[in-house]
Amino acid sequence: MKGAGSASFLLTLLSTITRTSAHGYVSNIVINGVSYRGWLPSQDPYSPSPPIGVGWETPNLSNGFVTPEEASTDAIICHKEATPARGHATVAAGDKIYIQWQPIPWPDSHHGPVLDYLAPCNGDCQTVDKNSLEFFKISGVGLIDGSSPPGYWADDELIENGNGWLVQIPADIKPGNYVLRHEIIALHGAGSQNGAQLYPQCFNLKITGSGTAEPAGVPGPELYSPTDPGILINIYQVLTDYVVPGPTPIPQAVEVAQSSSVITATGTPTPV
C-alpha cells in the first residue's frame, strides 16, 4: 500500500510540475531587422529602473498563463496585472513583425493556436485604460495537420521558426497608436474544463501609412468563453477540423508564410 501511495503521489507531483513549469513570454519584437525590447518578467520587476520597452509590463508570475475561467476578466487582455508599456515601436502598415518567444524552445508538448489582434488606443497607448481596448483579429492559425494525434499546430510551426512568429500589419489600417495583442493557447490539458493555458502578450505600436480601415473590435474579456470548442477540446484524437477561438479575422487580415528574422540593429522604444 505504501508503494501504491508513493506512486500516486509521484503522479500527482509530475502532473503539477507539468502544469506549472511550462511558461513563456516574448523577449523582443523585430521590425525590418530592428529589435525592440519587450518586458522580461524574470528580471524587470526586481529592477529599480527597468529599461523602457514596447512590451506591456507584468509582475513576475512565474511566466505563467491565464486560465479559461479568467477569460472574462481583465487578466485576459494583456496578461495578469498588466500595465501599458512605457514605449512604443513604429511600424508601417503592410510591414511584418517577428515576435520572439522565450524559453527556447517553446515546450513541444504545448500544442495549440497562435493568434494576433490589434486595438486602437485612441490616444497614447502608454496611458491607455486596458479595459477600453477593443480588439480585432489580424491573424489566427490553429490546427495545420490533425491526421496523427496530437497533431501539428501553429505553435509547432513557431518552434521550427526559431521560437518566433511572423505577423503582418494589414496594409490599409488607419494610422495611429495601437496595441498588438499576440497569444499562444496551449491545449495539452484542454480536454478537461479549465485545462487550456492562455499566454497573451501585448506591445505598443505606432502604425504609419495612409490607410482608412477602422475595423470594429471587442473588449478583451469578450474574446473567449471557457467552453468555446477551440478551448475545451481533446487534442489526443484524430481531428479533421478545429475552430480557432475568438472572432473571425478581419477581411484585411493576411496570413503570411512563416520565416525567422535577422536582427541587424537594436531599436530604442519611443516614450510618450
From Swiss-Prot:
It comes from the Eukaryota. It catalyses: [(1->4)-beta-D-glucosyl]n+m + reduced acceptor + O2 = 4-dehydro-beta-D-glucosyl-[(1->4)-beta-D-glucosyl]n-1 + [(1->4)-beta-D-glucosyl]m + acceptor + H2O. Lignocellulose is the most abundant polymeric composite on Earth and is a recalcitrant but promising renewable substrate for industrial biotechnology applications. Together with cellobiose dehydrogenases (CDHs) an enzymatic system capable of oxidative cellulose cleavage is formed, which increases the efficiency of cellulases and put LPMOs at focus of biofuel research. One of its GO terms (cellular component) is extracellular region. It is an enzyme of class 1 (oxidoreductase). Disruption phenotype: Results in about 25% reduction in fungal growth on sugarcane straw but not on Avicel. Results in moderate reduction in activity using phosphoric acid-swollen cellulose (PASC) as the substrate. Its EC number is 1.14.99.56. One of its GO terms (biological process) is cellulose catabolic process. GO terms for molecular function: metal ion binding; monooxygenase activity. Its cofactor is Cu(2+). Cu(2+) binds at H23, H110, Y199. Its main location: secreted. Disulfide bonds join C78-C202, C121-C125. It is found in: Secreted. Glycans are attached at N60. Gene3D superfamilies: 2.70.50.70. O2 binds at H188, Q197. Induction: Expression is induced on lignocellulosic substrates such as sugarcane straw (SCS) or steam-exploded sugarcane bagasse (SCB). It holds the Pfam family AA9. The keyword Ubl conjugation does not apply. Lytic polysaccharide monooxygenase (LPMO) that depolymerizes crystalline and amorphous polysaccharides via the oxidation of scissile alpha- or beta-(1-4)-glycosidic bonds, yielding C1 or C4 oxidation products. Catalysis by LPMOs requires the reduction of the active-site copper from Cu(II) to Cu(I) by a reducing agent and H(2)O(2) or O(2) as a cosubstrate. Acts preferentially on crystalline regions of cellulose such as highly crystalline algae cellulose. Belongs to the polysaccharide monooxygenase AA9 family. This is AA9 family lytic polysaccharide monooxygenase G. It comes from Emericella nidulans (strain FGSC A4 / ATCC 38163 / CBS 112.46 / NRRL 194 / M139) (Aspergillus nidulans).
